[in-house]
Structures are given as C-alpha cells and as structure tokens.
Design a protein with these regions (language model features):
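Extracellular lectin-like interaction modules
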Residues: 1-242
Length: 242
C-alpha cells in the first residue's frame, strides 16, 4: 500500500497491486493496470490506457480523469467524485460491469459500454457534459442521469443510448444550458425533467427518438422531430411537446 499527504507522479507505466490511500494529487503518464483501489484528496490523472483487474474498483478523489481508453474485465467501477472520460473521439470505455459516478461527469469518449447499469451523478445539481458525439450502451440495464445533461459549450453533440429492454431515466433538465444534438434511445424513456433550454425557453435538443415506451413526466422542446415508437404515458401535470 502507498499512503501519504504528498503528490505522487509516476512517469511511465503502472501495475498497481496494492491500494493507494490519502495521497494528494496522483498522476500516471503511461498505461495503468488498476489491480487495487485509489483514494486521493486531490485529482487523479491517467494519461495512458487504463485496465481494471481483480475485483470491483473504486477511485475516490476530487476529479478522476482518464485521457485514453479504459478497459475492464467485467468489474464494477465506482468513481466517488467528479469524472472526465477520454480526450479524443477514438477513446472508449468497455468491459465494465456497472458504472457509478457520484459527482459531475464530462464524456469525451466515442462509447461507454457496460453489462450493468450506468449512473451519472448523485444529485440533480450535478452536471453531465456530452463533450463529443457519444454512445452509451448497457446489456438490458438502466442508464440514469441524476444530474443536468448538457452538450459541451458551443457544441451540439449527439447522444445515443442503447439499453435493450431497460430504460433511460432523466432526473434533471436536459439541454438547459447548452442544447444537445440528436438524442436517440434504443429502449424505453422515463423523463422526469424538461428537455428545454432555460434561457428563452429554446429547444433542449435537435431531435428525440425513442424505440419503445415513453413516460413523459416533463415537457419536451426540440428544434426538429420527435419520434415515439412505443406507447406514451403522460404523468404529472399537463404536457407540452414542441
């Protein structure tokens, strides 16, 4: 095990088999094999490809940044803090069981693929920024956006969500600050917060497509088409689709 209140910088590759605890900032310039958990009081930055090995992995810190691909072996991944995934459209997250992020999330990966659930945020004030056109996929498991979902500032990025026979749940506003591009859901939709920009009540996305059922517990405002292939249920107050 490694512990201490100082920063720890590794120039090269890391094969971690013992826990790192209570380090300040932690960074690895090369590839990382995470066979143990990492806890920092500050940031964690993994510049090269990250591989998860062994059991469930927990990364705890202020902000955990992976700047390349992340590959699991069916382990669950828990990030306690903020998360930044990838820094290029070729980056991916694959092979993870469940993915749970308790803070803000920025996604710069082409895909995030898990066999189990994906949960982004722990409160409706958390933010999820879609930094590039991305596809989030599960194996018949739910994707939950607890926090606000926006595109990167100045961009209109598409968000594709594939959950099989499960559902996508939005608990906070979508596109309230920076509208998304096309939102495409293969699976069901459980909408508990508005899709609309706060300023001027403009569209919160370019379009919305849902392949199965939709529970509309909030209004939807898109600049283009809305397609609901399955049964639609209106819940709560009166609903406006525009």
């Amino acid at each position: 095990a490694v512990n201490g209140a100082q920063n720890l910088t590794i120039t090269g590759n890391l094969d971690l088999n013992g826990a790192i605890t209570e380090v300040a900032d932690f960074s690895v310039s090369g590839t990382t094999d995470l066979g143990a958990n990492v806890t920092t009081t500050g940031t964690q930055t993994y510049s090269g490809a990250v591989t998860l090995s062994g059991a469930e992995r927990t990364l705890q810190g202020s902000t955990i940044t992976t700047q390349a691909t992340l590959t699991g072996g069916s382990q669950n991944l828990i990030i306690t803090g903020n998360a930044v995934f990838g820094n290029g459209t070729g980056d991916t997250v694959t092979g993870v069981g469940t993915l749970n992020i308790t803070g803000n999330t920025t996604i710069h990966t082409n895909t995030i693929t898990t066999s189990g659930t994906q949960i982004y945020g722990n409160a409706t004030s958390d933010t999820i920024v879609i930094g590039t056109a991305t596809t989030l996929t599960t194996t018949n498991s739910q994707i939950t956006f607890t926090g606000l979902v926006d595109s990167e500032s100045g961009q209109t990025n598409n968000l594709t969500l594939a959950v099989g026979n499960s559902e996508v749940e939005f608990d906070a506003a979508v596109g309230a600050t920076t509208p998304l591009g096309a939102i495409v859901i293969t699976g069901a939709l459980d909408l508990d917060a508005i899709i609309q920009k706060t300023s001027g009540s403009a569209a919160g996305a370019t379009s919305l497509t849902v392949s199965t059922t939709s529970n509309l517990g909030a209004n939807v405002n898109t600049s283009g088409i809305q397609t609901y292939t399955g049964a639609v249920t209106l819940s709560g107050a009166n609903r406006t689709l525009k």
